[in-house]
Regions:
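Short Pro/Gly-enriched beta-strand edge/turn motifs at strand-loop
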Residues: 1-3, 130-138
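Active-site neighborhood of phospho(di)ester-bond hydrolases with catalytic His/Asp-centered motifs
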Residues: 26-28, 58-70, 89-93, 163-168, ...
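Active-site HxH/HxHxD metal-binding segment of metal-dependent hydrolases
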Residues: 50-123
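Binuclear metal-ion centers of metallo-dependent hydrolases, dominated by the metallo-beta-lactamase
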Residues: 103-131, 177-180, 200-256
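Active-site-proximal loop/helix segments of hydrolase catalytic cores
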Residues: 75, 139-205
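Active-site environment of divalent metal-dependent phosphoester hydrolases
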Residues: 14, 34, 67-74, 95-100, ...
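Conserved beta-strand hairpin/beta-sheet module of binuclear metal-dependent hydrolase folds
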Residues: 1-52, 147-167
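Pre-active-site segment of Zn-dependent metallo-hydrolases
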Residues: 23-63, 67, 74-79, 169-181
Length: 256
């Protein structure tokens, strides 16, 4: 069987455009400036989405891990969908008024969506003949965010599974549900990446040889010097036999 590349383009933070064969998925990629503690979308990115300009000629599915201003802006989602139709949306059920308002509008417009909850954790949804989506609830890191519904996505591309962990609470979640599941790649933020090698912090393990580090602030927003940390990651992981791919620049693309 032919193996097609999984192309991942970083927009900003945990926002990525994922392209596989003729399908494009936008994950955590619609957010604005308001209350955003991390980086903004690159200049012209949102306009390119609205107009269907490269690399956004196709936008088939929108996926969101949680309602935070650096991941998901419901008003921007609606603005996009008023200009362009998609095949479906995935996002966690949330009582926040902005999310509720979007949900009502999606229902009125007949736009297919999957509100995610504990009841959908075990559902693997075949969105295309060669792509399936599974989302499962994992707490957000930090006690102050405990009430925020948050999911991880396990996306399968022709039997190659890629895990996106967003802002998962790696201190209390060991991902045992994925024990024995080979993962083609795992996307982690820098804090999770650091904890991955420390068994006192993270008590789990991923069956993978590729870690992709995202949610790294761009240089102008990088008060914690995460860019320097990310640049050292591939060299530091060499002894472990892991391939580490840091995504640190706007519109940076990798192939898996």
């Amino acid at each position: 069987m032919d193996r097609y590349p999984i192309r991942v383009t970083l927009l900003a933070n945990a926002g990525v455009l994922i392209r596989y064969r003729d399908t494009a998925l936008l994950l955590d990629g619609l957010f604005g400036r308001k209350d955003n503690p991390f980086s903004l979308l690159p200049p012209g990115c949102r306009e390119a989405m609205l107009r269907g300009e490269p690399p956004f000629e196709r936008l088939d599915y929108l996926l969101f891990t949680h309602y935070h201003p650096d991941h998901f802006d419901p008003e921007m989602v609606r603005a996009l969908l008023e200009r362009r139709r998609v095949k479906g949306l995935f996002y966690p059920k949330d009582e926040a008024p902005a999310v509720q308002k979007l949900s009502r509008w999606l229902q009125q417009e007949g736009i297919p969506c999957v509100p995610l909850c504990r009841g959908t954790d075990r559902a693997a949804i075949q969105i295309e003949p060669d792509i399936s989506v599974q989302a499962f609830m994992v707490p957000h890191l930090g006690e102050e965010y405990r009430a925020v519904p948050h999911v991880c996505y396990l996306l399968t591309f022709d039997r190659r599974r890629v895990l996106f962990t967003a802002d998962s609470d790696y201190l209390h979640e060991d991902f045992s549900r994925l024990a024995g599941t080979p993962l083609y790649a795992v996307f982690l933020n820098p804090l999770f990446y650091q904890a991955y090698y420390n068994t006192r912090l993270f008590h789990g393990h991923f069956d993978t040889d590729t870690l992709c580090v995202y949610h790294v602030p761009f240089p102008e927003d990088d008060g914690m010097h995460m860019q320097d940390m990310a640049r050292r990651m591939p060299r530091g992981a060499a002894d472990s036999g892991l391939r580490v791919l840091p995504l640190t620049e706007p519109m940076q693309q990798i192939e898996l």
